[in-house]
From Swiss-Prot:
GO MF terms held by the record: ATP binding; glutamine synthetase activity; metal ion binding
Originating species: Azospirillum brasilense
Catalyzed reaction equations: L-glutamate + NH4(+) + ATP = L-glutamine + ADP + phosphate + H(+)
Broad class of enzyme this protein falls into: ligase
Record key words, sorted: ATP-binding, Cytoplasm, Ligase, Magnesium, Metal-binding, Nitrogen fixation, Nucleotide-binding, Phosphoprotein
Name assigned to this protein: Glutamine synthetase
Length: 468
């Protein structure tokens, strides 16, 4: 049975009323348009659905706005939140004038990275396994006006609520600052919420593993299994969608901001990755930590291009409030076996099939398709140019003396990341995976955000400087 036939079987089986077409913008935000089921026939899968691309930031100008959503029938899944029976289908964005994939479509770029890897003869499969963390609050308020800039959040788990009056009483069980890793209830108040999120993800076909409380108060993580690059990008988009909507249904609010809370750990998205060829893992060998030489070159490519990668893996100004010393954030560009203070870690596994590299500096504000594709391209460049990462750093990098620390390269800041991407993008442009036009438009988009941040007076500036 064809994938398109399966879509129509799902429509019939669930008495579907709407087909929700979903696509991802350059920032990583999921968008949708709902088609009444009567408009969906086999021709739609051939011709696609037209939409206005000028309304999406970083895409078309208004005088060339027409674009096509090309449905991917393999992604069809029932939506768990819609009141009317709704079938979700993820889409790629195409150029109507050429009938080819749009060069700025993130999902298309991820597909192009997989295709380039195979055409280069290095590997035929790239696996990615992200570990995305998030915060859940009971309430959040923020305001940005000429005369007022503020934010305020509240969570019953927060250490700042220890003396707060609650209608049913303040029961006192809550994690302290940096004290939230793996406690049982009642200190962990989010277990049922996370279990619901994980169950909904499983219903949507996302392969799930576990859930647990994270280090910070009100911080959580769901574990999903690794998959191929594009498929994992799809799974991450549904991960965020489910987390936001289940939290909303519980009367709470979830955020994937890397650093919403000052003074506690931020949220990362560690990315486990490996490449295979003809069913064989390419990262297992007899070098350091039982890695292959090819795996070391892959790590070398990531470390060499890390500052350009930061523009995709840590794309927001808030990202760099997480990447500071003192909060378990991997700011040092080094690699090590099992050592979580290094930005590239090689987890211990007994099986060669499980041999992988964990890149620890990315965060969940990243567009998953672009971040995964950029990491793969950096790793492939390392392999092609035999870029060795140097000696491993097996000591605790957080405790290095100042003179040793100064010799270890670090991740960068928001502006430096964009400048680095501008100067170091040739590895991304191989095979036209990331086109020059796409990179320039992405830099422009993120520069707008950076300028908005840099030119806005901050409340702490009033505290420090008002009386100068």
């Amino acid at each position: 049975m064809s994938d398109i036939s399966k879509v129509f079987d799902l429509i019939k089986e669930h008495d579907v009323k709407y087909v929700d077409l979903r696509f991802t913008d350059p920032r990583g935000k999921l968008h949708h348009t709902a088609q009444h089921v009567s408009t969906i026939d086999e021709d739609v899968f051939e011709d696609g659905i037209m939409f206005d691309g000028s309304s999406i930031a970083g895409w078309k100008a208004i005088n060339e706005s027409d674009m096509i959503l090309q449905l991917d029938p393999t992604t069809a899944v029932m939506d768990p939140f819609s009141a009317q029976p709704t079938l979700n289908i993820l889409c790629d964005v195409y150029e109507p004038s050429t009938g080819q994939p749009y060069a700025r479509c993130p999902r298309g770029i991820a597909k192009a990275a997989e295709k380039y890897m195979a055409s280069a003869g290095i590997a035929d499969t790239a696996y990615f396994g992200p570990e995305a963390e998030f915060f859940v609050f009971d309430d959040v308020k923020f305001k940005v006006e000429m005369n007022k800039v503020s934010y305020e959040f509240d969570s019953e788990e927060g250490p700042y609520t220890s003396d707060k009056d609650y209608e049913d009483g303040n029961l006192g069980h809550r994690p302290g600052v940096k004290g939230g890793y793996f406690p049982v209830a009642p200190v962990d108040s989010g277990s049922d919420l996370r279990a619901e999120m994980l169950s909904v993800l499983a219903e949507m076909g996302v392969p799930v593993e576990k859930h647990h409380h994270e280090v910070a108060a009100s911080q959580h993580e769901l574990g999903i299994k690794f998959d191929t690059l594009v498929r994992t990008g799809d799974n991450m988009q549904y991960y965020k969608y489910v987390v936001h909507n289940v939290a909303h249904a519980y009367g709470k609010t979830a955020t994937f901001m890397p650093k919403p809370v000052f003074g506690d750990n931020g949220s990362g998205m560690h990315m486990h990755q490996s490449i295979w060829k003809e069913g064989q893992p390419l990262f297992a060998g007899n070098q350091y930590a039982d890695l292959s030489e090819l795996a070391l070159y892959y790590i070398g490519g990531i470390i060499k291009h890390a500052k350009a990668l930061n523009a995709f893996t840590n794309p927001t100004t808030n990202s760099y409030k997480r990447l500071v010393p003192g909060y378990e954030a991997p700011v040092l560009l080094a690699y090590s076996a099992r050592n979580r203070s290094a930005s590239c870690r090689i987890p211990y596994v007994a099986s060669p099939k499980g041999k992988r590299v964990e890149v620890r500096f990315p965060d969940p504000s990243a567009n998953p398709y672009l971040a995964f594709a950029a990491l793969l391209m950096a790793g492939l460049d390392g392999i092609q140019n035999k870029i060795h990462p140097g000696e491993a750093m097996d000591k605790n990098l957080y405790d290095l003396p100042a003179e040793e620390l100064a010799k270890v390269p670090t991740v960068c800041g928001s502006r430096e990341a964009l400048d680095s991407l501008k100067a170091d993008s040739a590895f991304l442009q191989k095979g036209d995976v990331f086109t020059k036009d796409m990179i320039e438009s992405y830099i422009d988009l993120r520069t707008e955000e950076l300028l908005a941040f840099e030119t806005m007076p901050h409340p702490i500036e009033y505290k420090m400087y008002y009386s100068v």
